[in-house]
Amino acid sequence: LHPRVRRQRQMCIRDRSVTACKNQAKLIQQFTLSLLYLLIIHIVALLFFFLFRLVLFTSIDYQFPPDIQNNFLMQATAFIKGLWFDNVIACYILLLPLVILWITALCNYHSKWVFRFISIFFILFYSLSFIISAANIPYFSYFFKTINSSIYNWFGYGATTAGMVLGETSFYFPIFLGLISILLLSGSVLRLSSYFYHLINSKSTSISPINRLCIFAAGAVCIGLCLFGIRGRMGYNPIRVSQAYYCTDPFLNQLGVNPVFNLLTSTLDDNRKENRYLHLMPEQEAITNMQSILQRKGIEGISPIAREVKCAAVPTQKNVVLIFMESMSANLMEHFGSTEKLTPFLDSLY
């Protein structure tokens, strides 16, 4: 061949090699951008969860014991524990979008509807999470415990519950905080989705077996990390609420628990076989048998096995008073360092 022709062929081969390398780099960069898109949303969601926990920490009128009151390191540990639990919920939500973008990257398919679906998915599930987190603030303030499956008992009294929530002015701030968080997150997710879609779509190119292998390996590692985040720990059992307990203070121990996580786990626990309502025999048959054994007909409106007791002598009118204090903590007693004098009679009996 003529030297000039040979040189032109060599230049053509070199250009093709450079183009192929650039295409491979673009494909890897596309998947990297997809991962960056998911990571940013993940971090933004964790910041919102941190905000809800901070509001709960500052809004609860709680008196720390003297040994914890000025121990900021111990108080900060609750927020670190909270990040751990928040990440579990965020990984639950992250898993499906991560798998979808992994599959679309392997197929070199980047469609607008994919990012639109992922945006709606994030907005829907994080909105639900923020509603639960916002509801946890007044719930914790009233019951001194993280929101759990007991709230389902109120669903049968929808009108009464709504009236109680909307009629209490102290609940307005958590409601406002939840709505603002949903709006801010929705706007952020939509903007990020639009930005990364155009950024990834502008780099569209062909895909080679080597590219697929690299994307498959990177995606498998990321999905493995996400599943590990859902599990929460390397021990035999996955993360549990008890992992948040690290001190003797009941408030700090519960502060680290994510409300969504606690509601989810308590609901699952209620539906376990060993916790379900036992149907050993028909209820009416059991009542009839007990009435026959006890020789009672019961008192309507009180109990089917109740009986009326009539005193033969003159009653002495003595009373037995029982005091039940729901979610009462020993730290609120003067004996354990409280200066509020909330329970003077209980303190005198201790």
Task: Report the location of each language-model feature.
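Single conserved hydrophobic/aromatic residue that forms the stacking wall/gate
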Residues: 1-15
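Flexible, glycine- and charge-enriched loops at secondary-structure boundaries
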Residues: 2, 69, 339
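Short, motif-level signal for alpha-helix interfacial/capping segments enriched in acidic residues
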Residues: 4, 65, 114, 302-308
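Transmembrane and membrane-interface helices of multi-pass
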Residues: 19-21, 28-276
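Soluble catalytic regions of membrane-associated enzymes that act on cell-envelope
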Residues: 232-350
